[in-house]
Design a protein with these regions (language model features):
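Carbohydrate-active catalytic/glycan-binding domains of CAZyme proteins
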Residues: 32-354
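N-terminal secretory signal peptides that target proteins for export/translocation
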Residues: 1-13
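C-terminal motif of bacterial Sec signal peptides marking the signal peptidase cleavage site
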Residues: 27-30
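Sec-dependent signal peptide recognition
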Residues: 14-23
Length: 354
């Protein structure tokens, strides 16, 4: 094993990419004419290129990672950042899929889902998550609605993590008209994440500024009951739910520029107790979106930064780190490293993995 390096080599990102913040990004990037914008060339490859080096996706800009463990592999869905270098907004039209059986070598499986998968959507293939239930795969995604103002959440279904995915509803699962956004904002219904509890009940969490959840019916494509607002300190966006040793963990984008913080609860519906920050602001990007999984008795933390040459606020790249817990079950803050998989357990780490 190579000696771990703890700390990124800072790579200069273009001054022409304005760091406008989330509101301006939504207003500038959330237009209906993405198809008319130029396609972004592949990023230049950093030298040297080694397996397992962060960012792990290098042939294109990627973002909003969502990992799924299935059949001995990690299936990693990512957004595709296509904004030109001079752009001041997100250009995102599709999701890409990668898989690995060792967390080092990643196979690209193409584009299983795009905005066009949802006939009622017009643009903005933002954050997503896929989950398996009873042999079928459900892909929950953020897109901009073509006829209802604002962003919406759709769900597509397939018999394989590779797709093909189809929209069985042919309508949105959640729309901006179903919730009351603060000050009339139209991007509060984004960033879906789904968790299936031990009793088989599935829950959909989502939100920007206001975190929300609702039960899902057994068919996984309909809500089952009211939408419930949560109170999480500093919540911005990007919720993700996982469970370990009977404790529920809800991590999320915290503040702006975003760190990743988390809360814990004894049940999936709370009450949630704020526990603190686990990932600091990332290089070159004010947004920060995580995915947490257990794979082969180890825990991993996926996120995005802007570390590829030419990267920036709207041209991000997916990275991964090992994740550790202490004896009390608290998450030990993440070390952002060049080779995240080489980071050794810090003092006080216990539980899963060597």
């Amino acid at each position: 094993m190579r000696a771990p390096r703890t700390g990124f080599r800072r790579r200069r990102w273009p001054a022409g990419v304005a760091r406008l913040g989330l509101l301006a990004a939504v207003l500038a990037g959330g237009c209906g004419d993405e198809k008319d914008l130029p396609t972004l060339p592949d990023p230049a490859q950093p030298d040297p290129l080694e397996p397992g080096e962060n960012p792990i996706i290098r042939e294109r800009f990627s973002s909003d990672p969502a990992a799924l463990v299935h059949d001995g592999r990690v299936w990693l869905y990512t957004g595709h950042d296509e904004a030109p270098e001079w752009g001041n907004g997100f250009v995102m039209r599709e999701w890409h899929l990668y898989s690995s059986d060792d967390m080092v070598e990643w196979v690209h499986h193409g584009v299983p889902v795009s905005v066009e998968t949802f006939p009622w959507a017009i643009s903005d293939a933002w954050a997503s998550q896929a989950i398996e239930r009873d042999g079928r795969f459900y892909f929950y995604a953020t897109v901009r609605h073509a006829t209802i103002n604002g962003f919406a959440i759709g769900v597509a279904v397939a018999d394989s993590p590779e797709g093909p995915f189809i929209d069985p509803r042919r309508s949105a699962l959640v729309t901006n008209a179903m919730t009351a956004g603060p000050n009339g904002m139209d991007w509060d219904d984004i960033d879906p994440t789904v968790f299936i509890d031990d009793d088989g009940q599935a829950y959909l969490f989502w939100g920007n500024t206001v975190p929300r959840y609702a039960k899902l019916r057994d068919n996984m494509i309909e809500l089952d009951g009211p939408i419930v607002d949560l109170d999480l300190p500093g919540f911005t966006e990007a919720p993700w739910v996982h469970q370990r040793d009977g404790t529920y963990y809800l991590s999320y984008g915290y503040g702006f520029p975003e760190q990743i913080a988390y809360a814990t609860a004894p049940t999936i519906t709370g009450p949630w107790t704020f526990e603190g920050v686990i990932n600091d602001v990332v290089p070159g990007s004010p947004t920060n979106h995580q995915s947490i999984i257990e794979f082969q008795d180890e825990w991993y933390f996926f996120y995005h930064n802007a570390e590829l040459p030419g990267g920036g606020e709207f041209r991000r790249s997916v990275a991964v780190e090992r994740l550790f817990y202490d004896a009390d079950g608290d998450i030990i803050p993440i070390t952002q490293a060049d080779f995240g998989l080489d980071v050794q357990p810090p003092a006080g780490a216990t539980g899963d993995g060597p």
